[in-house]
UniProtKB/Swiss-Prot annotation:
Name used for this protein in its record: 7-methyl-GTP pyrophosphatase
Cellular localisation: Cytoplasm
Species per Swiss-Prot/TrEMBL record: Yersinia pestis
Site feature location: Important for substrate specificity: 12, 70, 154
EC number: 3.6.1.-
Function: Nucleoside triphosphate pyrophosphatase that hydrolyzes 7-methyl-GTP (m(7)GTP). May have a dual role in cell division arrest and in preventing the incorporation of modified nucleotides into cellular nucleic acids.
An annotated Gene Ontology molecular function: nucleoside triphosphate diphosphatase activity
GO (cellular component) term, any one: cytoplasm
Single Gene Ontology BP annotation: nucleotide metabolic process
Reactions it catalyzes: N(7)-methyl-GTP + H2O = N(7)-methyl-GMP + diphosphate + H(+)
Matches recorded under Pfam families: Maf (PF02545)
Active site: 69
Entries under HAMAP family matching the protein: Maf
Length: 198
């Protein structure tokens, strides 16, 4: 089996990939994440996921490299990680009572034969109408400063939602495992037939 490389230092993506019980390493890609003029959200996340995988290709010439990138769209605008309390408050105020869409680009690059597979998975989060006290209470408890959209769905963030809609809930956390599994199987790596990590 070719060695898997996760082109990310995200602890969230690492934890998701561990669910597949395959051996892998992580490495930090250096990529310019500036959107191109007129670029659609889907094209942006696919381009960045691909760029992250390709940024590591020279270091890993006989590997399967996984690249992923995610953006959150609130009210038609791309929203990033809040990084601070005041920005998180604004993001949750904007999301209150709205549908927020997450776009996650996924790339699997086989550097042994130079084949590449890219896709974009979307996931919709329907927020309850939130009071300012709820927003403040949530942010003080969970402090999701490094999470697009200012919440952690795998934690207390679930209390902010009315409903969720999408093919794979892992997409919301940053790595679509259903799509990734399909890509891996196409490359001859089936998580159910490979010896699991001890």
């Amino acid at each position: 089996m070719p060695q898997l490389v996760l082109a990310s230092t995200s602890s969230y993506r690492r934890a998701l990939l561990e669910k597949l019980q395959l051996p892998f390493i992580t490495d930090a890609p250096e990529t310019d994440e500036t959107p191109h003029a007129g670029e659609s959200t889907e094209a942006l996340v696919q381009r960045l996921a691909s760029a992250k995988a390709q940024a590591l290709a020279g270091r890993y010439p006989q590997h399967l490299i996984i690249g992923s990138d995610q953006v959150c769209v609130i009210d038609g605008k791309i929203t990033g990680k809040p990084l601070q309390y005041s920005t998180a408050v604004k993001q949750l105020q904007q999301a209150s009572g709205q549908c927020v869409t997450f776009y996650t680009g996924l790339t699997l690059l086989n550097t042994a034969n130079n084949s590449i597979n890219c896709t974009c998975e979307t996931f919709d989060v329907y927020f309850r109408t939130l009071s300012q006290a709820e927003i403040d209470g949530y942010l003080l408890r969970e402090q999701p400063w490094n999470c697009a959209g200012s919440f952690k769905s795998e934690g207390l963030g679930i209390t902010l939602f009315e409903r969720l809609a999408g093919r794979d809930p892992n997409t919301l956390i940053g790595l679509p495992l259903i799509a990734l599994t399909q890509m891996l199987i196409e490359q001859g790596v089936n998580p159910l037939t490979v010896k699991p990590v001890e």
